[in-house]
Swiss-Prot record:
Binding-site list for ADP: 12, 16, 267, 310, 411, 415
Organism: Clostridium botulinum (strain Eklund 17B / Type B)
Gene3D superfamilies attached to this UniProt entry: 3.30.420.40
Record's keyword annotation contains Ion transport: no
Protein name per the record: Glycerol kinase
A Pfam family per the record: FGGY_C
Stored PANTHER family: GLYCEROL KINASE, SUGAR KINASE
Enzyme Commission number: 2.7.1.30
Top-level enzyme category: transferase
Amino acid sequence: MGKYVVALDQGTTSSRAIIFDKEQNIVGVSQKEFTQIYPHEGWVEHNPLEIWSSQYGVLQEVLAKTNVTADEISAIGITNQRETTIVWDKNTGEPVYNAIVWQCRRTASIVDELKKDDEFAEYVKANTGLLLDAYFSGTKIKWILDNVEGAREKAEKGDLLFGTVDTWLVWKLTNGKVHVTDYTNASRTMLYNIKELRWDEKIINKLGIPTSMLPEVKNSSEVYGHTNLGGVGGVRVPISGMAGDQQCALFGQTCFEKGSAKNTYGTGCFLLMNTGEDMVLSKNGLVTTIAVGINDKIEYALEGSVFVGGAVIQWVRDELQFIHDAADSEYFAKKVEDNGGVYVVPAFVGLGAPYWDMYARGAIFGLTRGANRNHIIRAALESIAYQTNDLLTAMAEDAGCKLASLRVDGGASRNDLLMQFQADISNTQVLRPIITETTALGAAYLAGLAVGFWESKEEIATKWAISKSYGPTFERAKREKLNKGWKNAVSRVKGWAE
């Protein structure tokens, strides 16, 4: 047994490789950003070959800079941006089109057409746990087949393969030998029946997707195949853990108990609550998804997704040019006592849960002569907490109980002002763990469990520890007034681009 597990964390803006030891210590990290492609308004793409080269490059780099040898690696785990859709030629390995990213809204018109069939829309929700939305993979595959010359003909001949990013990476790591996904990633395609654990023929046929394109669905923790580290004649290392980024974060936060929840503050915000073996269908705009599948035992989760979370700070930095570094946002936000009545609604690509409005667009409200740069920066930061609170409120109603505490992770969870405001506006205890690399850690856990590197979930759970706790300080009247202002702002951006 080797001394380490490697997590490959393929995100929306960068690819990372992180080496963990048995005590969950980070031995080494390598990261590389890659190109964001915006061909038209509301469209977002990545180059699949750049996803692969950046991911494989950081794997080689982290091994080199830590002097960890391939035979010291027990397993590789993969976590990935979900829903992002890649279609490639199985004979040449060449993508037929760029990866269509989860944020991309190009299929909104396809979704509108599908929504006209009320019975079908209800069928999708009842069987996939998802809502009909351009966010998920299904309509993205349809778009590629309908719009890329020759794609549909090739697909119908069995020459094209579909995969979310996990599938693409495993296929590349195994030199095209293995075409698989796991339960969690399959559950984000809008094509997978999460009750019966199978690709849903009714939905696939409605979208005109040949079943030969679809990967085999496996557990989130099992050996899928091996990759050669160290070139020809190198060490064969098992790829043995795989789950979507948010499910990995839930697992990395050791939210193993029914009712436990976490929020990841990344490019978007993603709130997940473990509902155990119960498939809870939301009445409040959340989606139902698979939390994890181990030994063919499925656990479900309620999920709320915010499309623009930490990305609003990138916008403040890159487009407004109010700050030089994302970390500066806290410094400038603290220069004012409050938002001064200013609200930023960052609906740049529409609104996710619980609103699901593809046509909403971003706006700044409440500006006066006294409003300055710092108020806007603070309002942008606060928008992340307001959107999270919308999800918490919906989740409490669906689950029938208020969350006692919220475990947090992701880059923006290091922002003390944001975390305190989250506790205040949500009237909830916010807990930040010592290890905030919970997404990568979750992938490492899943891979390690499959090969006996860690013995059990119980062993893993004992390792979770709090770095900082934030308790609510707002009076009820203040909290309600601020939330009312937020709701007012959101109501004004809905349907803007219709």
